[in-house]
Design a protein with these regions (language model features):
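Long, low-complexity, charge-biased intrinsically disordered regions
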Residues: 1-171
Length: 171
């Protein structure tokens, strides 16, 4: 939507997010205030290790849900980037706790469904933010870093990634 008087443009995916919540039966879930709670210590060790567990998890729409979250993240919801990046690491063999984390992200979206990206206002300022962790990936002990650039109050291209590691050898 657009507010000409305030010189602002708002981008929203409220309808899309509501459809996603319905598709995964989370439209009546209790909302949470963070994209991914600290009690989630996700690891490949939580992936199914036997055929019964794998069969049970094959009935869970994990990949579809993560794909839906990725679309929202890329278009208008950079606030879920870290959480979506975390759950996407387990797409090849998700376990029950990984699915619980995906549902947590959906609960967060349920509580923030009306959030919008806002561009514009009086001063077109440029702001940058960054964050990182040290060995936050339980399985690989890799670190993660990310940044967000805002222009005129709205997020513009952002990135979260594992840093590139270089090894020097002397011959």
């Amino acid at each position: 939507s657009r507010d000409r008087r305030e010189k602002k443009i708002y981008l929203s995916q409220e309808q899309y997010i509501r459809k996603v919540l319905q598709r995964f039966q989370m439209e009546n879930a209790k909302a949470v205030s963070t994209p991914l709670a600290t009690h989630f210590k996700l690891s490949v060790k939580q992936s199914p290790s036997n055929e019964v567990e794998k069969t049970n998890m094959s009935r869970v729409p994990y990949a579809s849900a993560v794909g839906s979250l990725m679309y929202a993240m890329v278009c208008t919801r950079p606030d879920i980037a870290h959480a979506v990046g975390t759950v996407s690491r387990f797409l090849s063999n998700p376990g029950r706790e990984h699915w619980n984390a995906v549902k947590w992200i959906l609960r967060y979206l349920h509580g923030t469904v009306d959030m919008k990206l806002c561009f514009g206002g009086d001063k077109p300022t440029l702001m940058g933010y960054s964050d990182s962790d040290l060995a936050g990936d339980i399985d690989s002990r890799k670190s993660t870093s990310g940044y967000l650039i805002k222009f005129a109050g709205g997020a513009v291209p952002w990135l979260e990634e594992e840093p590139i590691t270089f090894t020097l050898t002397h011959e």
